[in-house]
């Protein structure tokens, strides 16, 4: 046996052995309960840092634990391989996106394998493979057949750097692209959409089923879906047969409407605009058209508007009110128009003051005054005033009364509205899934026949930074015959949003190599839903919402028999590293070029800011996993990742802390190696009836470790405290004087079994050194002996006047009377109560005895 711990020797040895034995393969035995453990698959960007690997290690610990607990486990891996970076690399480096992508996949797989992840690589998928995207296209055709995919002209978010369209969810709060960081522009294009709004209510209500999800994620999704209950009201336009339709959650304020606002893009805008205002309105529309949606709706940005010269009639008051257009109203949202109630809406109040529009109070707090000019909008419920027949009604009741009158008079009706918009999936780039549609002058948009799938990406494409779809420029690929009538037709040249690929990949893994169907429903229904999903909080809305949507659609297509894809979700925190930045230039400096004791810019000598920030290439602070595994081994890297912080919290990467985990594993190595040398393979059964006091204490420590570790790993996965329990058990064994006892042998084996999910290589090596011929990976998770947890003695705290003065050992299970007697007779108590009158004794069984004596 190796006399010292040498991870660089034992880890490759056991990884090769496990691969040869096929221990990571997914079992076909359906007699065991299933457990599907899944990490969000990565985009193959080129290289990994330990921030990326944290979630794979977390998932692997769970997968290994569940195998030991008797489950058949599926833990697959794949690549979210389409996307703009590959195409941009093709432009910059003159290589094909496929070549760049597959090289990155190979590099990242090479980085992952030394970590000892128990991944079933036989199920590996890549979304850029025609074998996979054939079925992505097939799914799109199902959406098309169900009326859930459609085309329409739309004002879209245009990324001027990546030269493509972005979904609303891909634009941040500052109006910038989620990927390139470019300021997003508005552009009118004919686009493909998926009708996610058809599932808005179910996506919202089914959040209640997700008891294993963080509340934060569910709240983010609920807010994104944004259900509003209110009224649809119509305001007739003066001199026209048309009406301005609005949605409001405050129909009780309708008597306070003093203007209505249209989106500049609203089709009624040119109709209601007067000749006198046309020039100014056209100029305003042109200026607004250059702004992104986020710019237009930002709360901290002043709202701009202009009167059209048109008038509408408030049907409840009969009064004429002006029609304006404003930048903050978007045609894609709601009806594309809003009613202005400045007295009771903060934004309307500011807009009305800015543009000298009337402010009419129609809701007041109880005892309030409707005549006093408002200094700010009153937005709370109250009593209706200046509201005709509804005066004096509580506003909550008034809402229903107003809706009832609107329905009776034909002015409107009750309505539920959602913030969620249909999902725009068109992208004007090459490296994505071609949309399987052919445009025929006779037949319109014709789906590609299923027999002709996949519509493969052509390889002879020229890549340019000039924008537009590269596919559209390749006539040999674009020009085809219509599948219906045979006429000359053209392929759809847009590709799909890459979030389509990741919206169903988890359904493919149970049947990853099926070339006859998207998957065998029996296999997928057996393994799904995913029991534990692990990934970043940044995917709370996009990926997780879209995956839920796809699952529900495919259920309705009779392909699945479940409603939700992921039972439990763990959103791991970020891994942060020491980061250096020049505050004058804003440039980040690689730590390797900085003296940590005196951080200065190596070129200018300027002092640098030093702080912890999320690992990323742009900040030069990423630590590649091999930097750790080459020096300390995978088990140390895994333990540090798990021990430093709870999984949902951010983790600060510190080299000294990594060293601490390496020292712990060295202690385990020495402890087990010394025992193996003494035991020489001999086995001795623990005789619980004949244990000495110290053996009982040691056995209690062993079973406390089993209990605490099991509880830490059951539910919330508190890996950090579980590792702490292993350290406590290691210390108890090291301190024990019973090293020849069968109890000590039980403790050593228990330590290795509990350590296995965290540090499988060292556990396997030491298990073999103890004389075992079968892999520790196939052993059963230790079970708690409840009897062992019961102590013969407990520690009793002695207090005098509420102040702790010492402790004594007393028999467990002692009565209150016995505890008081033992405490009175103890040396600790006698020092304070001897010769004094004890006025009162407070006994807390199992914890303390407190004596109250005169001062």
Swiss-Prot record:
It catalyses: tRNA(Leu) + L-leucine + ATP = L-leucyl-tRNA(Leu) + AMP + diphosphate. A motif ('HIGH' region) lies at residues 42-52. Residues 292-311 are annotated as: Disordered. Its main location: cytoplasm. Disulfide bonds: none annotated. Its EC number is 6.1.1.4. ATP binds at residue 617. InterPro entries: aa-tRNA-synth_I_CS, aa-tRNA-synth_Ia, Leu-tRNA-ligase, Leu_tRNA-synth_edit, M/V/L/I-tRNA-synth_anticd-bd, Methionyl/Leucyl_tRNA_Synth, Rossmann-like_a/b/a_fold, tRNAsynth_Ia_anticodon-bd. Residues 293-303 have a biased composition (Basic and acidic residues). A motif ('KMSKS' region) lies at residues 614-618. Signal peptide: none annotated. One of its GO terms (cellular component) is cytosol. GO terms for molecular function: aminoacyl-tRNA deacylase activity; ATP binding; leucine-tRNA ligase activity. It is found in: Cytoplasm. Keywords: Aminoacyl-tRNA synthetase, ATP-binding, Cytoplasm, Ligase, Nucleotide-binding, Protein biosynthesis. SUPFAM superfamilies: Anticodon-binding domain of a subclass of class I aminoacyl-tRNA synthetases, Nucleotidylyl transferase, ValRS/IleRS/LeuRS editing domain. One of its GO terms (biological process) is leucyl-tRNA aminoacylation. Belongs to the class-I aminoacyl-tRNA synthetase family. This is Leucine--tRNA ligase. It comes from Acaryochloris marina (strain MBIC 11017).
């Amino acid at each position: 046996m190796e006399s010292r711990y040498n991870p660089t020797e034992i880890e490759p040895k056991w990884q090769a052995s496990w691969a040869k034995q096929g221990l990571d393969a997914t079992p076909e035995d359906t007699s065991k309960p299933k457990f599907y453990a899944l990490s969000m698959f990565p985009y193959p960007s080129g290289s990994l840092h330990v921030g990326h690997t944290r979630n794979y290690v977390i998932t692997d610990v769970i997968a290994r634990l569940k195998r030991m607990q008797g489950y058949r486990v599926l833990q697959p891996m794949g690549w979210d391989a389409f996307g703009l970076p590959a195409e941009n690399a093709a432009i910059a480096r003159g290589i094909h996106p496929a070549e760049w992508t597959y090289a990155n996949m190979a590099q990242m797989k090479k980085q992952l394998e030394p970590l000892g992840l128990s991944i079933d690589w036989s199920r590996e998928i890549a979304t850029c493979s025609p074998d996979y995207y054939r079925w992505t296209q097939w799914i799109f055709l199902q959406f098309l057949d169900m009326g859930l995919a459609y085309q329409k002209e739309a004002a879209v978010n245009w990324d001027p750097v990546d030269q493509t369209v972005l979904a609303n969810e891909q634009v941040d709060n500052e109006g910038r692209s989620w990927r390139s960081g470019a300021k997003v522009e508005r552009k009118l294009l004919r686009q493909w959409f998926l009708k996610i709004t058809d599932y808005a209510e179910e996506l919202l209500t089914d959040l209640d089923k997700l008891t294993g999800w963080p509340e934060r994620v569910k709240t983010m999704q609920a807010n994104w879906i944004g259900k509003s209950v209110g009224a649809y009201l119509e305001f007739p336009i003066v001199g026209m047969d048309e009406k301005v339709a609005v949605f409001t959650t405050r129909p009780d304020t309708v008597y306070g409407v003093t203007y209505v606002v249209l989106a500049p893009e609203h089709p009624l805008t040119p109709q209601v605009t007067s000749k006198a205002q046309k020039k100014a309105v056209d100029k305003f529309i042109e200026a607004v058209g250059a702004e992104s949606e986020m710019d237009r709706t930002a709360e901290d940005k002043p709202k701009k508007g202009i009167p059209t010269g048109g008038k509408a009639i408030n049907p409840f008051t009969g009064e004429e009110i002006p029609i304006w257009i404003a930048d903050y109203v978007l045609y894609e949202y709601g009806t594309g128009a809003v009613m202005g109630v400045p007295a009771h809406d903060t934004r309307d109040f500011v807009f009305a003051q800015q543009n000298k529009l009337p402010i009419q109070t129609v809701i007041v707090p109880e005892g309030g005054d409707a005549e006093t000019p408002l200094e700010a909008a009153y937005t709370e419920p109250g009593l209706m005033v200046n509201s005709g027949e509804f005066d004096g009604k509580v506003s909550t009741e008034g809402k229903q009364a107003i809706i009832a009158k609107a329905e009776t008079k034909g002015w409107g009706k009750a309505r539920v509205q959602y913030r969620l918009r249909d999902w725009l999936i068109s992208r004007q780039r090459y490296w994505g899934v071609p949309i399987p549609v052919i445009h025929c002058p006779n037949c319109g948009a014709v789906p590609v026949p299923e027999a002709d799938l996949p519509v493969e990406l052509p390889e002879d494409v020229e890549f340019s930074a000039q924008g537009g779809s590269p596919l559209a420029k390749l006539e040999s690929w674009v020009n085809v015959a219509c599948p219906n009538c045979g006429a000359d037709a053209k392929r759809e040249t847009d590709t799909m949003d890459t979030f389509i690929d990741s919206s169903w990949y988890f359904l493919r893994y149970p049947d990853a190599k099926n070339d006859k169907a998207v998957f065998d429903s029996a296999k997928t229904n057996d393994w799904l839903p995913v029991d534990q999903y692990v990934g970043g909080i940044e995917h709370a809305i996009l990926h997780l919402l879209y995956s839920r949507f796809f699952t529900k659609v495919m259920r309705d297509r009779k392909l699945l028999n479940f409603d939700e894809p992921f039972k439990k979700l763990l959103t791991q925190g970020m891994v942060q590293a020491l980061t250096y930045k020049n505050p004058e230039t804003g440039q980040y400096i690689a730590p390797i070029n900085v003296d940590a004791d005196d951080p200065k810019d190596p070129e200018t000598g300027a002092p640098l800011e030093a702080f912890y920030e999320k690992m990323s290439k742009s900040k030069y602070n990423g630590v590649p996993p091999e930097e750790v595994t080459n020096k300390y081994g995978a088990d140390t890297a895994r333990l540090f990742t798990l021990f430093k912080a709870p999984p949902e919290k951010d983790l600060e990467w510190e080299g000294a802390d990594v060293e601490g985990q390496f020292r712990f594993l060295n202690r385990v190595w020495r402890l087990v190696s010394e025992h193996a040398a003494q035991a020489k393979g001999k086995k001795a059964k623990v005789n619980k009836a004949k244990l000495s006091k110290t053996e009982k204490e040691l056995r209690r420590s062993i079973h406390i470790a089993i209990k605490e570790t099991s509880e830490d790993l059951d539910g919330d996965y508190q890996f950090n405290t579980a590792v702490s329990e292993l350290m406590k058990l290691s210390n108890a064994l090291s301190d024990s004087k019973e090293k020849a006892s069968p109890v000590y042998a039980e403790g050593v084996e228990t330590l290795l079994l509990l350590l296995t999910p965290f540090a499988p290589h060292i556990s396997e090596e030491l298990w073999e050194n103890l004389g075992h011929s079968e892999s520790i990976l196939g052993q059963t998770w230790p079970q708690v002996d409840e009897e062992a947890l019961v102590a013969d003695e407990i520690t009793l705290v002695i207090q005098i006047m509420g102040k702790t003065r010492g402790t004594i050992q007393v028999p467990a299970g002692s009565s209150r009377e016995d505890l008081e007697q033992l405490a009175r007779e103890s040396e600790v108590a006698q020092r304070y109560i001897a010769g004094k009158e004890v006025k009162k004794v407070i006994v807390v069984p199992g914890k303390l005895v407190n004596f109250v004596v005169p001062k």
